[in-house]
UniProtKB/Swiss-Prot annotation:
GO cellular component, one term: mitochondrion
Gene for this chain: rpoB
Entry's Gene Ontology molecular function annotations: DNA binding; DNA-directed RNA polymerase activity; ribonucleoside binding
Disulfide bonds: none
Protein name as annotated: DNA-directed RNA polymerase subunit beta
Leader sequence segment: none
Function: DNA-dependent RNA polymerase catalyzes the transcription of DNA into RNA using the four ribonucleoside triphosphates as substrates.
CDD domains: RNA_pol_B_RPB2 (cd00653)
Heme as UniProt keyword: no
Source species of the chain: Marchantia polymorpha (Common liverwort)
One Pfam family named in its UniProt record: RNA_pol_Rpb2_3
Catalysis: reaction(s): RNA(n) + a ribonucleoside 5'-triphosphate = RNA(n+1) + diphosphate
HAMAP family: RNApol_bact_RpoB
GO biological process: DNA-templated transcription
Length: 1065
């Protein structure tokens, strides 16, 4: 049997980019047209096959450090021919620079790591559907989808008339479309399979006469397309307009579309014919007529065979095509200018690098599929590179996407993970590739299977797309491969034509490779996955991506076995490419000595990730020791001995404790703080730039007037903070003065007063220093002076300051397990108050037992009990999910047997009590009494998530107000206020606190006059006055109504008798 190894997780990105460099780039450059000027005097062409990519000027690491783009320059030979003189000029021209993919599978753009995610779209071709009209009669439609997303719909309505729908509201007879494409009626009737039926359907379309010629049909189609009434006469311009706007945009199939159309309609059109032909429309109409009479099948639009993946190669090739179109237009524009000025052009003067550079800059900067790489931990990077998005240009929108599109489909098996997706608006639209999935050249998702041979025991591996595996009976991955003798008798569950069947083993064609074949990398890291509800497994796989790398990483006791490959493929671990001897070793580099040369491996030292976590590598080898090829040289962040290590194995108990774990809240032991169990490092970057203003240049200095010397204590003579300084909130990091107009200061009354009394000159500059924001205290670890790439005139200098913080775990931080069991820390207990085991070990974390039954994530119980056994036996377990394929209750049996072994080996009978297996008697740390009920305890692998209270806590006493509503702004970053909504108002009304409610709705919110009056009252110590006018929000409502020509006024309605009672008014 052929042994199958796990594919490299980041391979999809590399394969896509290699295809672009090796095929897409030369293909697009070769398709660049020969350009002639209007007078046909000059002819310009480039030789795309002979292009050259220059070696990047900087290394990957230097590009990150200097905040520039890691790219390669493209050079191509160009030729300009003067036809009359027969003069030929040949030059090698610079087309522009293309960002290169680095060794991590990402792009460094302006010093920032970005990733291009794969897009999954409707595949071009034709799709048939049926729906009922308002009378309950079926309407059959065939939708032709072009390569660019344009659509042409053919339909047979309830009255058996055939239409071509050119927009939602406009449709024309199919005959008009076919005649406009150059056919005549006789040709059409000779080409269709059912001419009599076709003619009968056509006659029902309209009572008026059909167009007699192609010209009349073109006019008719043009009138319908542009909604033009009255008489219109044929002209060549109408034909060209229709060709460009209709046939080219809506009917360009591309290579994939042509293959799909040929397969669906059984055509033999050559693959290079990328536009829709009349014979395609005729074959499509034939199929539509067959559907009307019950022949043929309706397409399932959500099946993966009807969708394709746009990889990195396709997206970059589209951008290159756009850039070359812009270059073509710029060459034509230059030709026009050159002929007017009577200047002789050269190939170098014709070609400008701006179109290519700007197109790729726009794409990487603002395209929705080019995303800021999520670098919270190594797993996050891998999952981000393997993401599939249905959103983006040509795709779906989150507001209009239906439930059917978002749902799991049977064809996703082994290709798209049924578990891992976003929560909220993007659910089902953002997916993740399954662990073994591959993307073919045509954009189909493929999955590997073992082909079962009837003649021998050998099984070969084949890759099948979603369209191909429908014809096979496939045994599922959680079936056990039994002996040849027992296989023949056994009934096996299998997949066949999107359904699950139970068949004899001899009828099975293919077998799945791996029980985890159906799941993504994130879901595959969850042990005992099969015991969890899918919703909680989704949360678990998503929250692993939010885990912060800890100061002391620790690998999990219970895992699934793919932790090491995840760490290796993420690039955070340094691996030896050769065998040799470690000659030199320190914290910055490892020098490996080979027979004839030395290899220098530079390590990553306290580098900031995109998510402000710390990327740092520690050597794992010893000096003068010999190592082998593939051996781990250094561990990265969140890895331990080459394995992914996102959290910590800690002792947990499932029990209530004084109500402090109400609603998933969590109690922790103070040991986790003092022993730095959950301490993480975060590095924040602060930026300041000195610009050249209209009043003069800004300057960095340590001489800042009106600022306390204490705040400036860390600055050097240039006004920049010293590396290694410990800075607190409010300290100046970079001193900067900005010039301002002197005249305005002198015109101000206080300026004149100062001059008159003291003879003081008002300052000509104001301080615009970079200060440490609230919560930003820490150690300055790096200072970078950046020079801008484009050397723009108004930017003089940019400085980046990096501040490192060590954050211990605290109340308000979010922690989670791998099974979707998340919670917020509500209390930190002293060690002596924590419940403890019978051997005196205090519990580290108390979880709520009520969080398990209703959530149905029982996997956490199996994990924590097996972890407890592993901690006493000093064992690590790597268990592939779906172990029930061996026998019933296999997980439970394994856990209890390991607990029994641990109790025997350690002579602690309380580890496994037959009366309460998996539970223990705990002792209350405060009273010393045993708790009444036995309690489930174990070693769970708990993660500290990036949602930390230091980043979220916020308070406001005063701050900015919105200009229109005059209410406080929203959000922590804007120093905003807390929202008091209608429900909060109801609560205050329920308590009858009228004055507090009035203050909240007026003084504290948007009553401008009352705000000033309250300030004066507080200063003078007078009672706070009540607001007696309307707040700004009411005035805003009045103004908005006035803009609609509605005036609100108050009028006293009364009669002459002023003693009239109120009830009678």
């Amino acid at each position: 049997m052929e042994i199958f190894i796990l594919p490299e997780f980041g391979k999809i990105q590399f394969e896509g980019f290699n295809r672009f460099i090796n095929q897409g780039l030369s293909e697009e450059l070769s398709n660049f047209p020969i350009i002639e000027d209007i007078d046909q005097e000059f002819e310009f062409q480039i030789f795309g096959e002979q292009y050259k990519l220059a070696e990047p000027l900087l290394k990957e690491r230097d590009a990150v450090y200097q905040s520039i783009t890691y790219s390669s320059d493209v050079y191509v030979p160009a030729q300009l021919t003067q036809k009359k003189k027969g003069k030929i000029q040949k030059q090698i021209v610079f087309l522009g620079s293309i960002p290169l993919m680095n060794s991590q599978g990402t792009f460094v753009v302006n010093g920032v790591a970005r990733v291009i995610i794969n897009q999954i779209l409707r595949s071009p071709g034709i799709y048939y559907n049926s729906e009922l009209d308002h009378n309950g009669i079926p309407i059959y439609t065939g939708t032709l989808i072009s390569n660019w997303g344009g659509r042409l719909k053919l339909e047979i309505d309830g009255k058996t008339r055939i239409w071509a729908r050119i927009s939602k509201k406009r449709k024309v007879s199919i005959l008009v479309l076919l005649l406009a494409m150059g056919l005549n009626l006789q040709n059409i009737l000779d080409s269709v399979c059912y001419p009599k039926i076709f003619l009968e359907f056509i006659k029902k379309n309209t009572k008026k006469e059909y167009p007699n010629s192609t010209e009349d049909a073109i006019v008719e189609l043009y009138k319908h397309l542009y909604c033009i009434g009255g008489d219109l006469f044929f002209s060549e311009s109408i034909r060209k307009e229709l060709q460009k706007k209709f046939f080219q945009q809506r009917c360009e199939l591309g290579k994939i579309g042509r293959l799909n159309l040929n397969k669906k309609l059984n055509l033999n059109v050559p693959e290079n014919e990328i536009f829709v032909l009349p014979q395609d429309i005729l074959a499509a109409v034939d199929y539509l007529i067959k559907l009307k009479f019950g022949i043929g099948t309706i397409d399932d639009i959500d099946h993966l065979k009807n969708r394709r993946v746009c990889s990195v190669a396709d997206l970059l090739q589209d951008q290159l095509k756009l850039a070359l179109n812009r270059l073509e237009n710029s060459v034509l524009f230059f030709f026009r200018g050159a002929t007017k000025r009577k200047r002789l052009p050269t190939p170098k003067s014709l070609v400008t690098s701006t179109p290519l550079i700007m197109t790729f800059k726009e794409f990487f900067g603002s395209h929705p599929l080019s995303q800021f790489l999520d670098q919270t931990n190594p797993l996050t990077e891998i999952v981000h590179k393997r993401r599939l998005s249905s959103l983006g240009p040509g795709g779906l929108t989150r507001r209009t996407a239906s439930f059917q599109v978002r749902d799991i489909h049977a064809s996703h098996y082994g290709r798209i993970c049924p578990i891992e997706t976003s929560e909220g608006m993007n659910a089902g639209l953002i997916a993740s590739l399954a662990i073994h999935a591959k993307i073919s050249i045509l954009g189909c998702l493929e999955s590997p299977f073992y082909k079962i041979s009837k003649l021998s025991n050998l099984e070969e591996i084949i890759n099948l797309s979603a369209a191909e595996d429908e014809y096979y009976r496939i045994a599922t991955g959680n079936c056990l491969a039994l002996d040849q003798n027992s296989q023949e008798e056994q009934i096996t569950p299998a997949r066949y034509r999107q359904d699950f069947v139970a068949i004899a083993w001899e009828q099975v064609h293919l077998r799945s490779i791996f029980p985890l074949q159906y799941f993504s990398v994130g879901a595959s890291l969850i042990p005992f996955l099969e015991h969890n509800d899918a919703n909680r497994a989704l949360m678990g796989s998503n929250m692993q991506r939010q885990a912060v790398p800890l100061l002391k990483p620790e690998k999990c006791i219970v895992g699934t076995g793919i932790e090491s490959q995840t760490a290796l493929d993420s690039g955070s671990v340094t691996v030896s490419s050769h065998g040799g001897k470690i000659e030199y070793l320190d914290g910055n580099q490892i020098i490996l000595s080979l027979k004839k040369k030395k290899i220098d491996k530079n390590l990553i030292i306290y580098q900031r990730s995109n998510n402000s976590t710390c990327m740092h590598q520690k050597p794992k080898v010893e000096k003068q020791k010999y190592i082998k090829k593939g051996q781990i040289l250094a561990d990265g962040a969140a890895t331990a001995n080459g394995e992914l290590a996102l959290g910590k194995n800690i002792l947990v108990a499932y029990m209530p404790w004084e109500g402090y774990n109400f609603e998933d809240a969590i109690l922790i032991n103070e040991r986790l703080i003092y022993e730095d169990i959950y301490t993480s490092i975060h590095i924040e970057r602060y930026e300041i730039e000195a610009r050249v203003t209209s009043q003069g240049p800004e300057k960095f200095t340590n001489e800042i007037p009106h600022l306390d010397d204490y705040l400036l204590r860390h600055l050097d003579q240039n006004g920049i903070v010293l590396t290694g300084s410990w800075v607190e909130t409010g300290d100046v990091l970079v001193g900067k003065l900005t010039p301002q107009e002197t005249e305005e200061n002198l015109r101000a009354p206080e300026g004149k007063l100062l001059q008159a009394i003291f003879g003081i000159q008002v300052a000509t500059s104001k301080e615009t220093c970079l200060k440490v924001p609230p919560g930003g205290r820490g150690r300055v670890i790096d200072i970078r002076l950046i020079s801008q790439e484009d050397n723009s005139a108004n930017t003089a200098q940019i400085i980046h300051i990096y501040i490192l913080q060590k954050r211990k775990i605290q109340i308000g931080d979010k922690v989670a397990g791998r099974h979707g069991n998340k919670g917020i820390i509500s209390k930190i207990l002293p060690r002596q108050d924590m419940p403890f085991l019978q051997d005196g070990t205090p519990i580290d974390m108390i979880l709520s037992p009520l969080g398990v039954p209703s959530r149905m994530n029982v996997g956490q119980i199996f994990e924590c009990l097996l972890g407890l056994a592993g901690s006493f036996l000093h064992k690590n377990y790597r268990i592939i999910p779906f172990d029930e394929r061996y026998e019933r209750e296999a997980s439970r049996k394994l856990v209890f047997s390991e607990l029994y072994k641990a109790s025997k080996k350690t002579t602690n009978p309380w580890l496994f009590e037959p009366d309460n297996p998996g539970k223990n008697r705990l002792i209350d740390g405060r009273t010393g009494e045993i708790f009444e009920q036995p309690i489930t305890i174990g070693k769970a692998y708990m993660l500290k998530l990036i949602h930390q209270v230091d980043d979220k806590i916020h308070a406001r006493s005063s701050g900015p107000y919105a200009l229109v509503t005059q209410q406080p702004l929203r959000g922590r970053s804007r120093r905003g206020g807390q929202r008091v909504g209608e429900m909060e108002v109801w609560a205050l009304e329920g308590f009858g606190v009228a004055y507090i409610l009035q203050e909240m709705l007026t003084i504290k919110s948007d009553h401008i006059r009352a705000r000033y009056e309250v300030l004066g009252a507080i200063v003078t110590g007078e009672p706070i006055p009540k607001p007696n006018t309307a707040p700004e929000s009411f005035k805003l409502l009045v103004r908005e109504l006035r803009s609609l020509a509605l005036e609100i006024n108050h009028v006293i309605i009364c009669e002459k008798n002023l003693k009239l009672k109120l009830k009678e008014i």
